[in-house]
Amino acid sequence: EDYGINIHDLEELESDAGLGNGGLGRLAACFMDSLASLDYPGHGNTIRYEYGLFKQKIENGYQVELPDQWMKTGFMWEVRKPKHRVPVKFFGKVIWDESEGKWKHVDAETIYAVPYDVPVIGNDTVNTNTLRLWSAEPSEDFPSNHDFQRYIEDVRSICQNLYPDDSTPAGKMLRLKQEYFFCSAGIQAIIKAHLRNYPSLDNFHEKHV
């Protein structure tokens, strides 16, 4: 008020984050909020969707659904952390490498999962947790037998819509790729964090829930 600015005018400029939508999304958001408010350490993982659920508009008495472009003006609470990116590999095959004595994933389509961290702050607590949003980005290791434009479209589609139409085989494949991308990135990050503090995974079950 000292500067002649109405806080309510500023509030209207910031879009609601397209997070915590849908039944499971709402439940997960409540878990994250409760963990922080009860002062328990905890971290969440999700996909950094370009579009949220949808925006509703009424025209001539009928509902009209519009894309929820919640990041069109940026999201000030997130911090991009490219050095913590992890590769997520689709398709290809797994073979045993005798020379290295381990299994290897070859001929795969690689997509990078880049994290954006958002703080989750509790009410009257000293604990701040993290919600990690994973964004799909193309890999420099592009397969020579793939169409580049199609590859870029496949990468972008992973983080484009929260609930893509899965009534077709292509839609079902996209939903599966979204789930695999999210799980692979999250698990890789957890394992890497563990190995920064401990020499092996022998005590992994004791440190993570």
PLM feature spans:
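A conserved ligand/cofactor-binding region detector
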Residues: E1-V209
